[in-house]
């Protein structure tokens, strides 16, 4: 369990550091922040969605979509609408950093509105209604939440 929390903490620290760098460089207030990196044969776009206290990040690369957290219930429709405006129809990877309401509630809305291929989350159960809604929405897509071990590789983009 210690390794999983350590991995999650490292991932959160990396993503938040990236967010701070990009927001500092952009300096433009907006409901969503986008950074793109392009090379001769690939493009990756990272969208930081303003969902209040929580977090939501959309990463797009070569036609694939990764959603990291979804914000709280009050921002669920914003996240769904934003993804639709980005022409998202399928979420290849949905990642829940943890199951607090301000990170997972928006994922429920996305599960109810998009086809999802893979759901990745922390390896524990939380005794809350929003966690149960999340689990039910994952199951409705015929999926289970994956709990990868440190060092597990995934192909994206």
Describe these PLM feature segments.
Residues 2-12, 17, 23-157:
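Non-globular, low-confidence helical/coil segments that flank catalytic cores
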């Amino acid at each position: 369990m210690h390794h999983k929390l350590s991995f999650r903490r490292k991932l959160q620290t990396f993503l938040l550091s990236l967010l701070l760098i990009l927001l500092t460089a952009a300096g433009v207030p907006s409901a969503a922040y986008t950074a793109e990196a392009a090379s001769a044969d690939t493009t990756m776009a990272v969208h930081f969605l303003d969902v209040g206290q929580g977090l939501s990040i959309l990463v797009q690369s070569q036609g694939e979509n990764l959603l990291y957290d979804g914000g709280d219930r009050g921002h669920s429709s914003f996240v769904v609408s934003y993804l639709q405006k980005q022409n998202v129809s399928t979420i290849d990877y949905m990642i829940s950093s943890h199951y607090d309401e301000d990170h997972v509630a928006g994922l429920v809305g996305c599960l109810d509105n998009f086809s999802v291929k893979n759901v990745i989350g922390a390896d524990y159960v939380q005794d809350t209604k929003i966690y149960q809604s999340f689990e039910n929405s994952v199951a409705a897509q015929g999926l289970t939440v994956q709990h990868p071990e440190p060092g597990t590789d995934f192909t994206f983009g």
